[in-house]
Amino acid sequence: MTQIQIRMPTSTKPKVIDLFCGAGGFTLASWQAGFECVAGFDASEVLTSRFSENFPKTTFVKCDLQSAQVSDILRGTGLKAREIDGIIGGPPCQGFSWIGRREANDPRNTLIHHFFRLVRSIVPRFFVMENVPGLLHQPFSSRLKRELDQLPQQYSLLGPLPLDSADFGAATRRQRILIIGIDSRYVDSVAKEDIAKHYVRTIPTVREAIHDLPEPISSTSQNSDGWAGYSAEPFHGERGSYVKKARRIPPMHLGSVLSREFLSKGLVSGFQKTQHAPEIVRRFKSVAEGGTEPISRFPRLQWDEQCPTLRAGTGPENGSYQSVRPIHPSRDRVITIREAARLQGFPDWFLFHSTKWHSFRMIGNSVNPQMAREVLSAIRSRL
């Protein structure tokens, strides 16, 4: 565990910690739902590289949660265990995933155990864990049941609950499961119907999510984050609401000074250009909306549908595989970092890694912030 500078909690909001925080999708959702996320914990330097810029009021603690003790967690928060209202987190899930082979002995599978180990030790008023649907299948489902059976009896459990981020207003289809635990001594339980109240009436489309974004640019040492100006104004009325929300300048407890300043000038990051060889461009050109390029297996997005699940790829410790990136609906190129972030539900002030590879890992590994925000809002209304 590295030496840290603790940002002491300053508000009266319920306080949560984010385990396996990564880029901070759950952290973002917790702030937006009315919580104070006092600390995020993760072992990855790359996936958390912009965490402190995006969340200036949240302490980031680089640590291996497989070996972390409760004392390490409390030291990182500046709180006593009884002062932590909630624990949220999405332990890495590649070992459970249907994409590629599911590996029963993948060491990442034990991270769920450590999430629940810390929940059992800290005993927060509630917890929320997000993961992939593959966790519901053997042998992983038996392991999950053992973890849940060991929780203190006062927890009222909801889940594993299958959810799709599109139902909560994201422009991408992303199926995940959530497990919610509520300490019935302090908080009224949350039912599936309470979560369903947060479903949107109309699911946003790719067009509604990215219609105002510019073409990619060649990044330079002076502009490694790919800042560029918007290419259009948001649609009028309800069809423009997705973009208008994404463009909002954040409150002072969120976002960096740089992103706030640039956003106020109409500039947004994430437009680093991917250089495609002429042969690749020719292959992309032959793919209709909704089709798949037969060699790369890259799908072309459809303007008036949702984006399929955005994948993360892997880090160097697991082969450095780059994820399949969708082709833009009408341009013969893959989507940019910002287009992916928009589809996944991240606001425009949110910064990612300066490289496309790691940025797509950050986005693909993240809890969908819109889904998480609505689930946490349902819990917040009970506190």
Where in this protein do the model-derived segments appear?
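Redox-cofactor binding/interface segments in oxidoreductases and associated redox assembly factors
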Residues: 89, 129, 311-312
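C-terminal target-recognition/interaction regions appended to catalytic cores
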Residues: 233-383
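Short alpha-helical patches at coil-to-helix transitions and adjacent helical residues
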Residues: 23, 141, 176, 365-369, ...
